[in-house]
C-alpha cells in the first residue's frame, strides 16, 4: 500500500474518557500518519440505533438541549495534527471516502459493514468480547463476526471466540505499549508495601472484589497502602490507606502508581488484552492477575502470578507471599519488565500493514 492511501477508523461515541481500546486505535493512527498515510477518525453518534432515531437525537442534543455527555474534542490523548476527526456521525455522508475503513467495536460493526464501497475496504478490529455484559443482546457480538469484513483480533482467546461463532479464521495482531511512557524509572528493589488497582465501573473489571482482597491482606500487612486509579469516581467510601487518583496521566502512572507499587492487582474476569497489566510490568510492578485469556498472550507463571478468577483466598495468599518474600517479588517483577519489552508499536504496525495488504 502506497503512503498516500487513506485509512479511516470508525469509533463509538466520544466521551473524552481515557480508555485502553481507544488509546490503541489512537496510537495506530499516529503511527500510520508518521508512515505517510492520510488518517481520519470518525465517532458515531449512536451507531446501534436506527439512523432516523439517531439523527433526531443528534439534532436535539446538538442544537436544542444538550442531554448527553458526548464531546467534540479529545483532551487525554495527543493525536498528530494532520489526523482529521469527525464527531457524532450518523449517515454514510458523514464518513470521508477512504481506501481502508476499520470498525473498532461491536457497536460500529453494522454501521461500517453498511457503508458504500467508496468508504474503503472493510476491516473489523476486535479488541474485546463485547457480549451481554456490555449491554448487547445475546448473540449480537457473534453476528458481527460473521458480517464478511476481515476480522482482526488482539488475543488468542478472541481468535477462539471468532472461530466459535462460525466465522473464518481472523488475523492475529498482538497489542503493544508505549515504551516512551512506561519503563523502569523507580528501582524494583526498594519499594514500600504498596499495591495498585484499577477503579472501573465495568463489572467485569471487579474493582469491588479487588478491594475485598486488599482489605484481607491489610489484616496481615498493617503498613499496606493502596493506589486506586481510574477515570471514574470510587463507588464506595475509602479508608485512609487507600489513595485514589482520577484520570492519572502517564507520568503519574509510571512514577507514583505502577512505579511505586510492589504489586499490580488485576482481578478482572474479562479482558481483550490487559493493557494496564502490561504497563505495570514495564514500570516494575509484579502482576497478580486472574488467569484469563486477555493476559496469557504475554503473562505466564515466571513473569506474573496467575490465579483462578474466583479464588479469593488464593489471591490473598499470593499477594502476601510476594510482600513477605522480596526475593520472589523482585524475580517476578524483573522477568515481567524484561518480557514485555518485545511488544512495540513498530512491530504491530508493520503487521497491521501486512494484514491490510493481504500479505498474511
Residue positions per predicted region:
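Conserved acidic donor-binding segment of nucleotide-sugar-dependent glycosyltransferases
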Residues: 301, 305-312, 321-326
Amino acid at each position: 500500500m502506497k503512503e498516500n492511501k487513506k485509512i479511516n477508523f470508525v469509533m463509538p461515541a466520544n466521551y473524552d474518557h481515557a480508555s485502553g481500546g481507544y488509546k490503541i486505535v489512537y496510537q495506530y493512527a499516529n503511527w500510520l500518519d508518521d508512515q505517510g498515510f492520510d488518517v481520519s477518525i470518525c465517532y458515531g453518534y449512536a451507531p446501534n440505533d436506527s439512523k432516523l432515531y439517531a439523527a433526531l437525537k443528534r439534532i436535539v442534543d446538538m442544537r436544542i438541549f444538550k442531554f448527553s455527555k458526548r464531546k467534540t474534542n479529545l483532551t487525554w490523548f495527543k493525536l498528530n495534527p494532520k489526523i482529521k476527526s469527525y464527531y457524532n456521525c450518523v449517515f454514510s455522508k458523514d464518513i470521508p471516502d477512504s481506501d481502508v475503513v476499520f470498525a473498532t467495536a461491536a457497536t460500529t460493526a453494522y454501521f461500517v459493514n453498511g457503508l458504500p464501497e467508496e468508504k474503503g475496504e472493510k476491516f473489523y478490529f476486535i479488541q474485546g468480547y463485547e457480549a451481554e455484559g456490555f449491554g448487547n443482546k445475546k448473540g449480537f457480538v457473534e453476528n458481527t463476526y460473521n458480517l464478511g469484513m476481515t476480522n482482526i483480533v488482539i488475543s488468542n482467546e478472541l481468535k477462539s471466540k471468532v472461530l466459535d461463532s462460525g466465522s473464518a479464521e481472523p488475523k492475529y495482531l498482538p497489542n503493544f505499549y508505549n515504551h516512551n511512557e512506561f519503563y523502569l524509572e523507580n528501582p524494583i528493589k526498594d519499594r514500600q508495601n504498596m499495591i495498585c488497582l484499577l477503579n472501573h465501573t465495568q463489572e467485569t473489571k471487579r474493582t469491588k472484589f479487588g478491594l475485598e482482597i486488599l482489605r484481607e491482606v491489610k489484616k496481615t500487612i498493617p503498613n499496606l497502602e493502596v493506589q486506586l486509579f481510574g477515570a471514574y469516581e470510587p463507588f464506595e467510601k475509602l479508608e485512609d490507606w487507600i489513595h485514589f487518583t482520577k484520570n492519572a496521566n502517564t507520568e503519574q502512572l509510571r512514577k507514583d502508581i505502577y512505579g511505586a507499587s510492589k504489586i499490580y492487582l488485576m482481578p478482572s474476569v474479562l479482558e481483550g488484552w490487559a493493557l494496564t497489566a502490561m504497563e505495570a510490568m514495564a514500570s516494575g510492578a509484579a502482576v497478580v492477575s486472574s488467569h484469563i485469556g486477555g493476559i496469557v498472550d504475554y503473562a505466564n507463571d515466571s513473569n506474573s502470578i496467575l490465579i483462578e478468577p474466583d479464588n479469593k483466598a488464593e489471591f490473598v495468599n499470593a499477594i502476601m507471599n510476594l510482600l513477605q518474600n522480596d526475593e520472589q517479588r523482585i524475580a517476578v517483577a524483573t522477568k515481567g519488565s524484561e518480557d514485555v519489552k518485545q511488544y512495540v508499536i513498530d512491530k504491530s504496525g508493520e503487521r497491521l500493514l501486512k494484514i491490510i495488504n493481504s500479505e498474511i
